[in-house]
Structures are given as C-alpha cells and as structure tokens.
C-alpha cells in the first residue's frame, strides 16, 4: 500500500519513490499506511451482528454462529444489543406492524451500521409478496448493503454474505449514506 505525500517530488510518477520507501521499510518490519485503511481493516475483523429473526430464515441464521460454521473465526460475533452491533441481519417476513420496530432498532445502532437482508421474504416479500400486511422488502424501511437470496438461504449463503460485507467495507471504506 503506497502513501502519497505532498513532499514527494519524484517527478511525474510520484508512486515510484513511495513504493521504494515502503519496500525498504517493510524489510525492516515497518508498515506505511493511512489511518483510514487501518480503521477499515480493524472494522472488518471485528463485525458484531445482531439478529432480527422474523420467520424460518432465523433458524438458518442461528446455524451460522454454531460450531460447524464458526463465524467467529472470521471476526464476526453475535451481540444481543443494537447499541453494540455493527450489522443487523433481517431474516424472514417483515410485516407492516413490525416495520416501525425494525426502524427503531436500526436507529439505535451506532455508525457505521450495515444491514444484511436474508431470504426471499426479507428481500422482496417472498411467498407473501401480495399480502396486505407484508412489507415488500426490508429495503423500504432501512438501507440494505447485502442481499442473501434463498427460501430459506443456507448457513453457507449467509456466511458468504457476511464475507461479502467485509469485502465491501475494505473496498469502499466507510459507507456514506
């Protein structure tokens, strides 16, 4: 990772001098990077997720944190309180009565906060899409970062979605809404 500085006057290609300096310092056990990159690296390695299980997808969501899949080896651990969570996983059918509660819990989460929509019902209403009491996708209530398809999606699919969220955070930094 190269660092651009204002004092770097290596001609047209300023990256050449910076890369040489980085290589020399790495040989001696030092690393040059930006603070934002370190914060994003730490954020992806310590995601705390909160479950918002509404229907059958919640069973698969519970499987993800069990020993067979062991999400904690990726730095992803469950939390019970929205005030300690970075990620909310919405799994299942979201009804009109439950939508204000979902928004309230989302608002209690600290910034930056991320949402994963898990399953067909959370993504777009699923089997109950035309019901009068169902919200046709939780993205109408809260902004969604990752969609995990399936009815119900497997624990592997949710784990893949969590890893994709980590990738998205590393690639884009803090997601500005």
Swiss-Prot record:
Name used for this protein in its record: NADH-quinone oxidoreductase subunit B
Taxonomic superkingdom: Bacteria
Protein's membrane topology: Peripheral membrane protein
PANTHER family: NADH DEHYDROGENASE, NADH DEHYDROGENASE [UBIQUINONE] IRON-SULFUR PROTEIN 7, MITOCHONDRIAL
InterPro entries in alphabetical order: NADH_UbQ_OxRdtase-like_20kDa (IPR006137), NADH_UQ_OxRdtase_20Kd_su (IPR006138)
Coiled coil regions in record: none
Organism (species): Ruegeria pomeroyi (strain ATCC 700808 / DSM 15171 / DSS-3) (Silicibacter pomeroyi)
Subunit structure: NDH-1 is composed of 14 different subunits. Subunits NuoB, C, D, E, F, and G constitute the peripheral sector of the complex.
Residues given in the record as [4Fe-4S] cluster binding sites: 56-57, 121, 151
GO annotation terms (biological process): aerobic respiration; electron transport coupled proton transport
Cofactor list: [4Fe-4S] cluster
Annotated SUPFAM superfamilies: HydA/Nqo6-like
Catalytically driven reaction(s): a quinone + NADH + 5 H(+)(in) = a quinol + NAD(+) + 4 H(+)(out)
Co-factor binding comment: Binds 1 [4Fe-4S] cluster.
Cross-referenced Pfam families: Oxidored_q6 (PF01058)
Molecular functions (GO terms): 4 iron, 4 sulfur cluster binding; iron ion binding; NADH dehydrogenase (ubiquinone) activity; NADH:ubiquinone reductase (non-electrogenic) activity; quinone binding
Enzyme class: translocase
Record keywords, A-Z: 4Fe-4S, Cell inner membrane, Cell membrane, Iron, Iron-sulfur, Membrane, Metal-binding, NAD, Quinone, Translocase, Transport, Ubiquinone
């Amino acid at each position: 990772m190269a660092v651009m500085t204002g004092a770097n006057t290596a001609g047209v290609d300023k990256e050449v001098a910076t890369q040489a300096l980085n290589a020399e310092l790495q040989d001696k056990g030092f690393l040059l990077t930006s603070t934002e990159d370190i914060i994003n690296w730490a954020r992806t390695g310590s995601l705390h997720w909160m479950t918002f299980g509404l229907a059958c997808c919640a069973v698969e969501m519970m499987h993800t944190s069990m020993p067979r899949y062991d999400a904690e080896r990726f730095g992803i651990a469950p939390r019970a309180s929205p005030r300690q969570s970075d990620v909310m996983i919405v799994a299942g059918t979201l009804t009109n009565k439950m939508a204000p509660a979902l928004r309230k819990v989302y608002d209690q989460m600290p910034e930056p906060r991320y949402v994963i929509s898990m399953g067909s019902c959370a993504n777009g209403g699923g089997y109950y899409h035309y019901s009068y009491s169902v919200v046709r996708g939780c993205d109408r209530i809260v902004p969604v970062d990752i969609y995990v398809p399936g009815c119900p999606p497997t624990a592997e699919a949710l784990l893949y979605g969590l890893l994709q969220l980590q990738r998205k955070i590393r690639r884009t930094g803090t997601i500005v809404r």
